[in-house]
UniProtKB/Swiss-Prot annotation:
This is UPF0246 protein Pnap_3166. InterPro entries: YaaA (IPR005583). It comes from Polaromonas naphthalenivorans (strain CJ2). GO terms for biological process: response to hydroperoxide. One of its GO terms (cellular component) is cytosol. Belongs to the UPF0246 family. Pfam families: H2O2_YaaD (PF03883).
Length: 258
């Protein structure tokens, strides 16, 4: 099984990585192409394009200027350790050992507007470029057109060795949309996390994000190999609800009656 996650806007380059193991990102040529487009924009244009404050726009213009096609220990950090935010707080990769990170490297893909797909140990330079950004390039009017079938093609390559390939989708709709379903050959199983609020179950965004990270952590710790095993996830009070689920949509609930 391959697990898919979204990236995070928040980054941590201040905390040193606790492991030295790393790999080079796979789509460096495409990333350089996007950086060239971004470098040509003024802070005001970046602010408008990405709906950022002047301060954040300035920070990211500086990041684009500093970005280099050579990824080193001085300008990069392993993606799974660099991303911060709710998903990555749940995953808590800084407390995973080398063997666990090696397993994650083989079973986790992080979707990215700039990098396409990142493996956990891929070196990553700091950036901000959400997949839904309407960035016009030579390949189209947005990043979905820029990436086209490339991400799905890569996932097909990764899943090719599996007899019954399964993609466990823990990414947001914005990011999973970058995976061409027409091209993707694997079965897709989506996990949904709901909370009891008022008189019904609802998806609460920041809680669902954390739960996605917790699910990946559970998969890593238990080296999950089948969809059936996903149903055993019970971190922080969640419980699989068979009655609310479908074959390819697993619902986990927390709160009253769960």
């Amino acid at each position: 099984m391959l697990f898919l996650l979204s990236p995070a806007k928040s980054l941590d380059y201040a905390t040193p990585a606790h492991v030295a193991a790393h790999t080079q990102p796979l789509f460096k040529r495409q990333s350089a192409e996007l950086i060239a487009v971004l470098k040509a924009k003024s802070p005001q244009e970046i602010s408008s394009l990405m709906k950022l404050s002047d301060a954040l726009a300035g920070l990211n213009v500086a990041r684009y200027e500093a970005w280099s096609p050579a990824f080193t220990a001085h300008n990069s950090k392993q993606a799974v350790l660099a991303f911060n935010g709710d998903v990555y707080a749940g995953l808590d990769a800084k407390t995973l050992g080398e063997a666990q990170l090696a397993w994650a490297q083989d079973h986790l893909c992080i979707l990215s507007g700039l990098y396409g797909v990142l493996r956990p140990l891929d070196w990553m330079q700091p950036y901000r470029l959400e997949m839904g950004t309407a960035l016009v390039t030579g390949r189209g009017k947005n990043l979905y057109q820029f990436w086209g079938a490339q991400i799905a093609d890569y996932l097909n390559e990764r899943a090719a060795t599996d007899v019954s390939p399964v993609i466990v989708n823990l990414a947001s709709e914005e990011y999973f949309k970058s995976v061409s379903r027409k091209v993707l050959k694997a079965r897709v199983v989506t996990c949904v996390f709901e909370e009891w609020r008022g008189d019904k179950y609802k998806i609460i965004s920041f809680m669902a994000k954390r739960a996605r990270g917790l699910m990946v952590r559970y998969a890593i710790e238990n080296r999950l190999a089948t969809v059936e095993k996903l149903k055993g996830f019970e971190a922080e009070g969640y419980c699989f609800d068979a009655s609310a689920s479908a074959v390819d949509r697993l619902v986990f609930r927390r709160g009253q009656g769960a």
